[in-house]
């Protein structure tokens, strides 16, 4: 029954060239950026499915734009559900996704970005465990850029999404402040990173293509096979990014 499940919703955009990962253009082309978006989405969804084999999770894609249902139906693992789009802006999308999933009767809700394909599966499992413990709380996964890659809730708290400077380095800090204002305890997960600019793309490439001993890597993450395969192809075909993407097995 849904009240016994944690609804884990990926905040997902369909891979339409020119509308996704535009901060990576250049060095990527708009088409390459769209292909990277698809690879990341696929890996994040498979990661959620992996976590669902270890914890009481129902996977969702809170998708945008309207009319892209077929794209997600073809991409998502079996058992995933679609959450129709409400708003194009990040803050309102998060707010409405959380509200709608609680209204559907789920016992807890976790919203996760689609930009962290190597997020360790155990962080998703840990989130459900934290949300199953007695007492109200919010679970936050801080991102290296000052935002968060995940927010988990036991109850809907609209205040967590208000007065936030979205898409800035202040998001995580402001969300902590909003939680304090309403007396809501915060459980903090390990830091991870989003892939949305050249620096983080380089970090992703080092993690997936350089091996576990590469200096400066986030180690122990999800293998992200679709994203790794895309990066290997990219390294062979786009001369503008070859210096960013090491060959597999080299530091």
Model segments located where?
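A short, N-terminal amphipathic alpha-helix
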Residues: 37-55
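Short beta-strand/loop segment that forms part of the nucleotide-sugar
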Residues: 57-65
